[in-house]
Amino acid sequence: RPWEKLVELIEADQPEQVKEYLQSMKTEDIVLSISRLEKKEQLLLLTLLSPEDAAELLDDIPEYHATDILEEMESSRAAAIFNELDSDEQADLLTEMNEKEATAIIEQMEPGEAESVRRLIKYEADTAGGLMITEFLSFDKEQTVGDVVHELRKNAEKYEDYNLQYIYVTAHGRLEGVLQMRDLLMASLQARLDVIVHSDVISVMDSATLHELINFVNDYDFYGVPVLNDDGVLLGVVLRSDILEAKSELASIELLETQGIVGGEELRTMPVLLRSRRRLSWLTVNIFLNVLAASVIAFHQDTLSSIIALAVFLPIISDMSGCSGNQAVAVSLRELSLGLIRPFEVARVWLQEFSVGLLNGIVLGVLIGAVAYLWKGSLVLSLIVGGALMLNTIVAVSIGGTIPLILRRFGADPALASGPILTTITDMFGFFLTLTFASLALTHFGTI
């Protein structure tokens, strides 16, 4: 277990050995080891490392772990570490931290770093402004290639962590175009940048949403994209890697929300009360939704007591219809995230899902009807449960495909609310169909 060796080195107060051991570890082993350390050991670890090495370590671990450690650290030490982080990482961590602690850290950061991060934390995390970095190469169009080379050589240490693939050319801060490093290498030192610049540059606004950025990386295979404000001023660059990382995080959050866990990422190292509260948010709502569905059974309890066999098939009809509906929900959520459908296309999606629901409903209805007939030898019972499952599947699939679009149209989170709403509808409708058909059969035939 890698964390045991790490604890030994921390307790022995051996910073060089700690650094060497961390460098020898895989990223996943580092993440696991940090999660196994006690809080005091985590703090001591970051104290033993240099600010630069500590920043590199924090970049590897989940944001929750990083902010949890930094909030317990002296603000001066935390500020020294923040100075070594990329600007987007600074903003991400500070927005997750306690406001008082975050303010104290910003006040002790280097003036340039503090000014940069203050601008970034004003943006929503899932916008271009919130994802962009401010470490990029930018030069005025009137400068020469020689000026650029001189600046890069003079401040080599400053630019060592910058990506030197692209150089952005500006005029009074406004983006004019872009150059690749090879353009500089092939040009004369006396050449002005406005002569060799590529002016047909693609950019995004600082208010661009994550979904718009995802569409961008799907359309263009760029290292990154420059971010502008309404006046065309170059503010930063959103890296392709950061967009893909944000996309992955969004998918993880949506997966948790479909299971009724709200409030973002959950890790078992988080406080028990926080984890409990996030899970209870929808569990408590589900109590009332399930009571609503169960009320249908209560209304038909005389029918159910007369035909005990129905009690066996009710959960099957409910579960199978729910599974079919959730498949449609998953497809709609996926297509919404990819921009393949729009919230106003409810009728189109309903028609497409209705045909699938009809076909699958017939197949599932025949199968469950055959099971009922083989078990009880009753044709009426097989028609009741088969017909109920067929119709409920059609309803579940048709509605399941449209619920995410309707929720998105009204500004609600489709990943969070689609599942509980669909479950309630399929349960109520499935119970209603089965028990209503059974009541009619009893009235007409007297027995089943």
Describe every region a protein language model picked out.
Residues 27, 282-290, 313, 317, ...:
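Alpha-helical transmembrane segments in multi-pass membrane proteins
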